[in-house]
């Protein structure tokens, strides 16, 4: 595939010399949802599909960007001296935001580059196509301009780009998983301290199956920011009653039970309940995984979905239909929505002998309930972003 992309790059940019190649994965979160911005634990892994880039450094200050996923937009061009959010630049605002964030932190970027992107992550599926292109851009900048910057710092700058430049209040999980991914491992990440641990995911005769609702959704204008605000308000209420925390993720379920009566707003209470219980589920689930107890891990995935449905209310008809159909299937170890919600994807662990029937039956039931066709992917856990030799 890379050979074809190089060929396309040379045709589009009318160039015949040497080029650089990079890859950045998508990610799926196995458990610990909407906990990252609540200072809690998440458990994502990088996928073996993602975003590819073919790049050539330029002598001037122009950036020329082309995406095989948005060919109708042609080459999007902007200048190093004028890095502002521009709606007409569409997807290219993501790399642009990363470049600006690097410059704002005084990293020396003195010229532009030509780049061809191609992603085989479905856009809007909640598998972090945006974090993938952000971290990919950071890796390109480090390599082309020989920058002295470590991957964790790059990940943080990508989150800043998404928060400040794009305007989505996302936590650090997506960029961290994309940048720090490790083959056959998921990452237990404490989003408050950024302490992390690689945990091998040993699925014997089982697969991770991702199902895409194919429901259109926009993260920036969805109810994502509302949920975050509710949790922040709950923290304020607790602090006014001398609980003294920065994030809900600092409370155990037992501690929360003792103080939750202070939160009188019903909606805030439900949101806070999810944040605290999901954080505990993530920690317990990882302990089961370390003992190779996939059955218990799966049960906690199911409980996670129920909490996201009932307390956090971020699922909706499409995600619930996929998950409930999955729960009815023989061979399903666990199934839940993954990502921000309101559409996007589910993640399931399914016994290999039943994967074909799972895809067929869940797809059929989903179409009957929603009128939409779901897409299914068997996910392999891959490495984080880097240069391709």
Curated annotation (Swiss-Prot):
Pathway listed for it is: Carbohydrate metabolism; galactose metabolism
Catalytic positions are 174 (proton acceptor)
Q: What UniProt keywords are attached to this protein's entry?
A: ATP-binding, Carbohydrate metabolism, Cytoplasm, Galactose metabolism, Kinase, Magnesium, Metal-binding, Nucleotide-binding, Transferase
Q: What class of enzyme is it?
A: transferase
Q: Which InterPro entries match?
A: Galactokinase, Galactokinase_bac, Galactokinase_CS, GalKase_N, GHMP_kinase_C_dom, GHMP_kinase_C_sf, GHMP_kinase_N_dom, GHMP_knse_ATP-bd_CS
The biological processes this protein is annotated with in GO are:
galactose metabolic process
Compartments, as annotated in UniProt: Cytoplasm
**Any GO CC annotation of this UniProt entry:** cytosol
Q: Which domain of life is it from?
A: Bacteria
Q: Does the keyword Membrane apply?
A: no
Q: Does the keyword ATP-binding apply?
A: yes
EC number(s) given by UniProt: 2.7.1.6
Q: Which residues bind ATP?
A: 67, 124-130
GO molecular-function term, one example from the UniProt record? ATP binding
Give me the reactions it catalyses: alpha-D-galactose + ATP = alpha-D-galactose 1-phosphate + ADP + H(+)
What residues correspond to the site Transition state stabilizer? 27
- One Pfam family it belongs to: GalKase_gal_bdg
Q: What does this protein do?
A: Catalyzes the transfer of the gamma-phosphate of ATP to D-galactose to form alpha-D-galactose-1-phosphate (Gal-1-P).
Q: Which family does it belong to?
A: Belongs to the GHMP kinase family. GalK subfamily.
User: What is the recorded name of this protein?
Assistant: Galactokinase
Question: What gene name does this entry carry?
Answer: galK
């Amino acid at each position: 595939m890379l050979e074809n992309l190089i060929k396309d790059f040379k045709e589009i940019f009318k160039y015949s010399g040497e080029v650089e190649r990079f890859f950045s994965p998508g990610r799926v979160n196995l458990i610990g949802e909407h906990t990252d911005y609540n200072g809690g634990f998440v458990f994502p892994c990088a996928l073996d599909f993602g975003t590819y880039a073919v790049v050539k450094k330029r002598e001037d200050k122009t950036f020329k960007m082309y995406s095989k996923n948005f060919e109708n937009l042609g080459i999007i061009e902007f200048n190093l001296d004028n890095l502002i959010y521009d709606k007409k630049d569409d997807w290219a605002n993501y790399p642009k935001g990363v470049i600006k964030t690097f410059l704002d932190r005084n990293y020396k970027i003195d010229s532009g580059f030509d780049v061809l992107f191609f992603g085989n992550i479905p856009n809007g599926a909640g598998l972090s196509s945006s974090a993938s292109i952000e971290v990919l851009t950071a890796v390109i900048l480090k390599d082309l301009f020989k920058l002295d910057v470590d991957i964790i710092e790059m990940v943080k700058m990508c989150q800043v780009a998404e928060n400040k430049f794009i305007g989505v209040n996302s936590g650090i999980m997506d960029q961290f998983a994309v940048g720090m991914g490790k083959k056959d491992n998921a990452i237990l990440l404490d989003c408050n301290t950024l302490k992390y641990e690689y945990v091998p995911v040993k699925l014997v005769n089982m697969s991770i199956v991702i199902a895409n609702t194919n429901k259109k959704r926009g993260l920036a204008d969805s109810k994502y920011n509302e949920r975050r605000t509710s949790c922040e308000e709950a923290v304020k209420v607790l602090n006014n009653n001398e609980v003294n925390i920065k994030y809900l993720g600092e409370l155990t379920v037992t501690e929360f039970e003792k103080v939750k009566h202070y939160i009188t707003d019903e909606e805030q209470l439900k949101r806070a309940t999810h944040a605290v219980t999901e954080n505990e589920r993530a920690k317990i689930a990882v302990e089961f995984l370390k003992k190779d107890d996939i059955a218990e891990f799966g049960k906690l995935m199911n409980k996670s979905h129920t909490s996201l449905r009932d307390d956090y209310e971020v699922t909706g008809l499409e995600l619930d239909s996929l998950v409930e159909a999955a729960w009815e299937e023989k061979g399903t170890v666990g199934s839940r929505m993954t990502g921000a919600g309101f559409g996007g994807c589910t993640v399931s662990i399914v016994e290999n002998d039943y994967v074909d029937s799972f895809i067929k039956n869940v797809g059929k039931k989903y179409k009957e309930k929603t009128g939409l066709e779901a897409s299914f992917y068997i996910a392999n856990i891959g490495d984080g972003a880097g240069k391709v030799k």
